[in-house]
Every structure is written in C-alpha cells, then in structure tokens.
C-alpha cells in the first residue's frame, strides 16, 4: 500500500482497526461466557476491506 494515503482512506482504515477488537472481558463475565466472539471480527489476510 502507498505510504502517502488520502485522508479519507486513512480514516476508514483507522476506524476498521478500532472495530477489529475482541469482545471486552467485562462483557464475557457479565453474560456468563454466553458471548465470547463477535461476528464482525476481521483477519488482515483472510478478509479484505472495500477501499
């Protein structure tokens, strides 16, 4: 990927990076481990973003 990115693309990538987190521990504890994963988790090599 280019080192010089347009700002809009950079913001989209940053948002995707922030969304790509695990479920917080307090959620797992509060739901008695009923919620362990979230379906929108993305792996950088398997699933690419629309750019």
Swiss-Prot record:
This is Large ribosomal subunit protein eL39. Belongs to the eukaryotic ribosomal protein eL39 family. SUPFAM superfamilies: Ribosomal protein L39e. The keyword Ribosomal protein applies. It comes from the Archaea. Pfam families: Ribosomal_L39. Keywords: Ribonucleoprotein, Ribosomal protein. The gene is rpl39e. One of its GO terms (molecular function) is structural constituent of ribosome. GO terms for biological process: translation.
């Amino acid at each position: 990927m280019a080192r010089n990115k347009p700002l809009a693309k950079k913001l989209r990538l940053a948002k995707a990076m922030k969304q790509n987190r695990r479920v917080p521990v307090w959620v797992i504890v509060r739901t008695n481990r009923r919620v362990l994963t979230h379906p929108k988790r993305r792996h950088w090599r398997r699933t690419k973003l629309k750019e």
